[in-house]
Amino acid sequence: MENWVELKKGAKVLQNNKNNKILIVTHIDTDGLTSRAILQKLAERLNLDADFMFLKQITIETINDIPFKDYDLIIFADLGSGQLKMIKEKLDELNLSDKRDKIIILDHHQPEEIKIPKTIIHINPLTIAKSGAEICGAGVSYLFAKAINNDWIDLAKYAVLGAVGDIQNIEGKLIGLNRKILCDAIMNGDVKVKTDLQMYGRQTRPLFVSMRYWADVRTDLLNNDSKIIKYIQSINKKYDIEINPTMRLAEIPFEHKRIIGNELLIKCLNYVPNHWTPYIPKVIFGEVYEFRGEEFGSPLRDLEEFSTCINACSRYGDYETALNVLMGDRDKYYRKMLSNLRKHRNNLREALEHVKNDVEIIQKDRFQYFETDKIMSNIVGIVAGMSYSIEEVDWMKPIFAITEDENGYKVSARCPKLLCFAEDVNLAKAIKYASEKVNGSGGGHKFACGAYIPDNKREFIKYLEIALR
């Protein structure tokens, strides 16, 4: 990234602070954890005097937990761009506004529109006319590390995992800056790229289970194991092949998966509007990414499954387990991660049953929503996405889930990938507009985002209707 001035400047400032006290603050999702892994490796290699801190988000409350005065340099990764004004005001309040290059922000989220003060080095792809959808926070952290030492391509694998965890392969493959980072990870022998069916659980689930939960197009196969098995048997008969529905996707020959994909494409044509049909192939086939160094059949081999394992820890505050597994532990912490994963899946199952049996899905013209105080706010977004498997949920509309949080309400929004492709729905823009109208804050991605609102649920819904017209 020869022309990325702020990236070069940030790398130089870090090297100038090698003997000073440094604090590195990262977000808590897969992108945040992989950013932390990259920056922790960087700190070890440069022998920095660095402390680390995880932060769920920067708010008026949590910014007071950041010890700005105790450190010469503070680095934020996968957060900070959306809170530039708040960070600037806190530095002013603490009489630190004369400290040049006090803060480095490594982020990819939409920045606040303010004049960047001399105290902050803001490294974000959007400032160089790149998209925040083609590189994640870990990707920016990786390029930052590479600006210090161009040979550190062994760190690229973390950035690829961060990108997959942030669903930046939504178009069926990683693009733009992510593609260049992926090439580094491939060159270093860490990541393998394949074309495969876009179904979750390639390494760990039987084929029929992966098909059971595939909801990018709602067909008669969803949640119907007997129908899925009969469907596979009919494919076997039609093509004179033998696909075992209990085999994992990773075990099935590509030629057989290509046949399944083609048959699924034909089936899906009966379930979508005509103008959606050109986009169906993108949700059936695409690139998948594996870590070569992980065992075949391990939930850590497929990067989507690895990301779920991280979420099963970090969403419940167990950052230590996720980080240690990322850094290479396959003993004590890996066993703890698998235990966390079982609990996480059980929580999701119970929450989905609650939505199915006890919650009213309220339909609006352009979206739908539900309210509950029975689902943990840390998983409500995942549950919102999973709710498309429920018959009462209209799979052709976005869904918003509203649950109580410490200081008001958390709102999580999801929509099917096809809706983003065919109708150009942008939930992030809508939720940001509606939340700010009621003195809250929100943002994220076109297809998955969230917000915090103090109260005014009814007003928030009203502004959502305006935003999604």
From Swiss-Prot:
Superkingdom of origin: Archaea
GO-annotated molecular function: nucleic acid binding; single-stranded DNA 5'-3' DNA exonuclease activity
Gene3D superfamilies: 3.10.310.30, 3.90.1640.30
The protein's name in its UniProt record: Single-stranded-DNA-specific exonuclease RecJ
Gene encoding the protein: recJ
Stretches that traverse the bilayer: none
UniProt organism field: Methanocaldococcus jannaschii (strain ATCC 43067 / DSM 2661 / JAL-1 / JCM 10045 / NBRC 100440) (Methanococcus jannaschii)
GO biological process, one term: DNA recombination
UniProtKB keywords: Exonuclease, Hydrolase, Nuclease
